[in-house]
Amino acid sequence: MVLLNSEEVSCNDHHQVDVVAAAGLQCSGDMLGDKQLVSQVILEGLEIEEPPADEMEAAEKKAGISRLMAGYVQHLQHRSAYHLGYPLNFDYDFSPLAPFLNFSLNNAGDPFAKVNNSVHSRQFEVAVLNWFANFWDVQRDQFWGYITSGGTEGNLYGLLVGRELFPDGILYASNDSHYSVFKAAKMYRVKCIRIATTVSGEMNYADLKSKLQHNTNSPAIINANIGTTFKGAVDDIDQIISTLEKCGFQNRYYIHCDSALSGMMTPFMKQAPKVSFKKPIGSISVSGHKFLGCPMPCGVVITRLEHAEVLSTDIEYIASRDSTITGSRNGHAPIFLWYTLSKKGYKGLLKEVHICMGNARYLEVLLKQVGISASCNTLSNIVVFERPKDERIVCRWQLACEGNLAHIVVMPNVTFEKLTVFVEELAEKRKDWYQDKGFDIPCLAVDIGKENCYCNLHAKKLRIPKM
């Protein structure tokens, strides 16, 4: 067995990046193909083999596995310090909950139903669901929901409810919607019409109106984004409802709110459109491992009780009814979410939101001060900027990229100091790209607006912002 170990290799002239050589985790802009990945697993000693019959060999292999695991922990610790492009909150300590990992907890079926199995965490799950019901203004006897495997499952569930209520409905989703929304349309064989977006990533309501008016005979199933994946744009629920009703869709529409990241943040912003079941929406989903932070992917989906009943089925084997997508569900996630919400409360979450938003504004200004095109939506902790020319920078800082753009999601664990180091490094490398190698600075006016573009054409007309 090749032991897992962390080593430092040069990624550029000024900085080092870690590589776990035995895992084949190289700093490269290229993705490994399926065959390459299989070869890496075999080559690096990660292929699963039967334990040796000889006691000494078995003991040696056991020690090797321990070293491999310890090395991988070291690798994850190091790489977590350079994680900027994806919405994960690493700022937590769940060590007091470690004893729960000695139990296999399965919250199969309806979390509110009695079951024969006693090894579960349903009471924690219901407590978490009640918290979110209060968060989104729905009375406890008027909602149903469950803890999901993440934002995608929440979208799949919410849009399935919409499809069941309106079997002949058309799904309307903006171009900036998460890919899981279009996956749901394909899975459920629902006609899907894409809606244009503004430069900020928000739904273009004029385009929504136009497309609704061309399909007035079919009910509308709307996916509203409370924070788009790449730009963090927030669709205005009130504007969507108004557009639907002006187009003659009264009582013939269903709105699902994809609130994966920003759904935990916008309620703490006074200027944000309020997402609430006091409005005629059908469901809301949010991720638990993003802003809240959780070791395992998870999420929450809430719908109206009357809507949930269209999916409910009694299952004799588990002595419960089930309206969920997956059936078996992670019973540890509810405990971790309950623990976080209990420790932080509204005041703690409010504080974290303000810190993240402040740091996001700082990053946007800092990028612009060194001449880098950048933009940050008012209600978002996501900063979009010019994609680095060197993919090693993308890899080192684990940036998410789309076309000419990259983005950083400023989470609670992303500090002021870390952002400063990143911008200093990027600015230094950028001089090499544009001065020494003669690259042209790309124009991003179409992507983020000319007021945020620092290309040669637009930079002369802009003022450098101050802190």
From Swiss-Prot:
Keyword tags: Decarboxylase, Lyase, Pyridoxal phosphate
Keyword Iron set for record: no
Catalytic reactions on record: L-serine + H(+) = ethanolamine + CO2
BP GO terms, sorted: carboxylic acid metabolic process
Binding of substrate, residues: H178
GO MF assignments: pyridoxal phosphate binding; serine decarboxylase activity
Pfam hit, one: Pyridoxal_deC
Keyword Chloroplast found: no
EC numbers, comma separated: 4.1.1.-
EC category: lyase
Cofactor(s), names only, from the UniProt record: pyridoxal 5'-phosphate
N6-(pyridoxal phosphate)lysine, modified sites: K290
Family affiliation: Belongs to the group II decarboxylase family.
Role noted for this protein: Catalyzes the biosynthesis of ethanolamine from serine. Decarboxylation of free serine is the major source of ethanolamine production in plants and ethanolamine metabolism is crucial for the synthesis of choline, phosphatidylethanolamine (PE) and phosphatidylcholine (PC), and thus for plant growth.
PANTHER family on file: PTHR46101, SERINE DECARBOXYLASE 2 (PTHR46101:SF8)
Name of this protein: Serine decarboxylase 2
Organism whose genome encodes this protein: Oryza sativa subsp. japonica (Rice)
